[in-house]
Amino acid sequence: MKTTRTSAISVLVFVVGLPAGVANADFTFGEPIQLVEPIWSPGHDPQGCCFSGDGLELYFSSNRPGGYSGKDLWVATREALDASWGEPVNLGLSVNGAGSQVEPAISPNGLELYFGDWSDRNIRVCKRTSKDAPWSSPEFLDPPIGLGNELQADFSADGLSLYFSSSRSGTYGKGDIWVSTRATTDDPWAEPTNLGPNVNTSGSEGYPSISSDGRILFFNHGTHIWMTKRANKSDTWAPLVNCNIIGAPPMFDPAISPDGSVLYFETGYAMWQSSITPIVDLNGDRTVDSADMCIIVDNWGTDNSLCDIGPMPWGDGVVDVQDLIVLAEHLFEEMPGRPIEP
């Protein structure tokens, strides 16, 4: 990384002073790829998944053979982020029981597991003292979150915020996305807050998945996957935007990887993944070159989202060396035409 950073800075010195162009950047979703064995095969109906904090574990719900009930929770591991998933392991009878256990959410430290059950609308909690210890028996999540109409939880990267879907009093429609916070991972959850009218509508919103930097929230609105963005963790959420992932709806259960490079979701009783890539051809001339680097230099230190392309695909809120590093990785590449705006 040090070598890459040094090279990027060297290129920056080269391009300073050159004329800048018009910025025109964003990020795109790649064509979806269906997951195959050992994670999914025909006849195995998934129902939600989530990544561990390091991205090396995938927790998911499935009716695959070897389970104890209708749908069980499983975990698959991999050696590296670019490695294939290994054979899934059932979480066992301490977690899985009668009915169907669905929509798992694993805490960043790996010691708390939240999930739903089709028998009711209650979030259940299993805990363990270490990653090598067995899971405790499930217990209902206590109020103020657990009121009997909550589902589809997801943790923030620090484990101090919990996003979930609920039709409790105060919703704007049939079901809204709420968030609750806690001071430490040992403290109880505070009174939940509705994410507001920019996110929640008169329809139904659910299946939240928060990015590791806390700046992008993916979720379901109707039968499509949508997202909302904010400048930082203390800012308000922007109006929801359709992700426009290639393929026919319905699409459900989005799960963003910790590095923001891929989105998992479900459609047609199968699990799929779509890559997320920043558009590095900033001036739209289909070539990444010094003109694009000049655009970054011209916007250096600003919060111009059109030039903010790193380290996450949607940037980090400021145009700086992280964006230059990402651009340098694609220098002199030819790019396809920009996608047509919806």
Regions flagged by a language model, labelled:
Residues 277-342:
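Cellulosome-associated attachment modules in secreted, modular CAZymes
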Residues 13-14, 43, 92, 196, ...:
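Generic detector of short alpha-helix boundary/capping microenvironments
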Residues 22-278:
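Short, conserved micro-motifs composed of acidic
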Residues 9-19:
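Bacterial N-terminal signal peptides
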Residues 4, 18-19, 49, 289-290, ...:
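Alpha-helical interaction segments
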Residues 1-11:
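Bacterial N-terminal signal peptides that target proteins for export
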